[in-house]
């Protein structure tokens, strides 16, 4: 269990909130998180790369020149892998890169990753509450009030972000918005700072408790 200080949107302290999640043992946590990240990145790959072998590439039916008498190496086809425009040996073919990981392990890895970032985490009581219409500058100013530096990658975790907040954050290169029930290990570890809405903390503990 850990206790986070809660900040208001204007940057002032407003109280405290607790985050209590079960994590993996210290001896196995690194391996667990590594496998979770590897799986996530592998499953994003399209696997559509494809090349032609010598049997698939066009042409090559006739012998390019006679077997003997030219002084050159013998060739049986213009589509041999040894010639430009020839087939590819052991080139890529469409395949699936998907890796399996059972649900309990995935959730344990996510909880462990989240709790490992407690020192970089800030709880925000009313993130973007003053926004009436999409305005990127208001979000940038708000992040500065919360102690976020310009060059830091930030993951904003909210329970149910409004369209106004989504559109306001969308133009900021190093800020990513994610719903509390759609967390993933890579984004948690990739960010320099994590901003979590107070209601999102309740949602996280409800969804990922076990």
From Swiss-Prot:
Residues 60-71 have a biased composition (Basic residues). The keyword Iron does not apply. Residues 46-89 are annotated as: Disordered. The keyword Ribonucleoprotein applies. Keywords: Ribonucleoprotein, Ribosomal protein, RNA-binding, rRNA-binding. Pfam families: Ribosomal_L4. One of its GO terms (cellular component) is ribonucleoprotein complex. NCBIfam families: rplD_bact (TIGR03953). One of the primary rRNA binding proteins, this protein initially binds near the 5'-end of the 23S rRNA. It is important during the early stages of 50S assembly. It makes multiple contacts with different domains of the 23S rRNA in the assembled 50S subunit and ribosome. Belongs to the universal ribosomal protein uL4 family. PANTHER family: 50S RIBOSOMAL PROTEIN L4 (PTHR10746), LARGE RIBOSOMAL SUBUNIT PROTEIN UL4C (PTHR10746:SF17). This is Large ribosomal subunit protein uL4. The gene is rplD.
